Each structure stands twice: as C-alpha cells, then as structure tokens.
C-alpha cells in the first residue's frame, strides 16, 4: 500500500462552496511548527469548515461512497458487455463513478478512434448524457456523472451508447 505524504483537495469538497484542503503527514506538519506563525486569510474560515463538515456528513449518512461503488460497478459491467459486442471499445477502466472506455479502430494496433469518439460524444449529448473525451490521444470516453446518478440512469446510458455504436 502507498500512503501519500501530501494530498491536495478542492472543488467538490465544499459542494458548491469554495473550499480546499491540504492534508499532510505529521512529519510535514511539524515542519510548520518552527516558531513562525503561518497565516492565511481564509484558512479555517468557520463557514467553510461548516460547509465541508456538512458535505462529509451527507456522504457518510447517505452512504454515497457505497452508492458510487455499486453504481460504478453496474455501469462498468454494462460497458464491458458492450465491449464484447463492439470491437471499437478496446478497454473499460475506472473506479466508482469515474469511468473511461477507450475507443480504438483496431484492438490489434490500438489506433485511436478519434473521429468516432467525437460522434459518440455529440450523439450522447443529443440524447441527454454529458460525456467527454480524455487521454493523451483524446480517444477515451470519460464518464463522470454526479453522485445522484442511479443504476437506472446507468442502464439508460448503456442502452443509448449501444444504439449509437450500432449506427457507427
């Protein structure tokens, strides 16, 4: 297991309220305990801390991590079924609700299917699903839905992606 020395978090941890955090090991934190007082205008702001705590409470009480894990697995299984049906899907990977499906013109050469993925992204948008491209070759279909995304939503995404890929 790898334990990071420093973790920087931001954006979603305040659920719309501007909030960021830097979490460090005790050893690194002790380096700041040198007699000089560290000052930050917004550091430890009570409103921000309350917002962050509320977000953590909701994540825990509503079992959002478990939901993301279960819904993500459901979605990945559906994408893998599509991978068995469509050779254009060269790989499916991810964790929770952060998933990628790599589109290739050939599984042997792994040539990126960039024009095809652009069509898929636009047609998914037309059908009400916001997905995008990622990866150094821009051929990975990035699926990163909000936490409220359900298994029913995932099933609809798979059904629509199946229809689009059938038409390519």
Predicted regions and their residues:
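Conserved N-terminal phosphate-binding loop of PLP-dependent enzymes in the Aspartate aminotransferase
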Residues: 1-168
């Amino acid at each position: 297991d790898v334990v990071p020395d420093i973790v920087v978090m931001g954006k979603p941890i305040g659920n719309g309220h501007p909030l960021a955090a830097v979490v460090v090991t005790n050893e690194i934190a002790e380096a700041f305990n040198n007699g000089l007082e560290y000052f930050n205008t917004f550091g430890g702001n009570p409103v921000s801390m309350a917002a962050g705590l509320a977000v953590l409470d909701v994540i825990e009480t509503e079992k959002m991590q478990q939901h993301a894990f279960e819904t993500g697995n459901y979605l990945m299984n559906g994408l893998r079924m599509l991978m068995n049906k469509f050779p254009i899907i060269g790989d499916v990977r991810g964790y929770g609700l952060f998933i990628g499906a790599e589109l290739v013109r050939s599984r042997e050469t792994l040539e990126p299917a960039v024009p095809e993925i652009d069509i898929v992204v636009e047609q998914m948008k037309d059908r009400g699903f916001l997905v995008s491209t990622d990866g150094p070759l821009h051929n990975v279909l990035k699926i990163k839905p909000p936490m409220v995304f359900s298994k029913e939503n995932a099933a609809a995404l798979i059904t629509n992606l199946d229809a689009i890929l059938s038409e390519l």
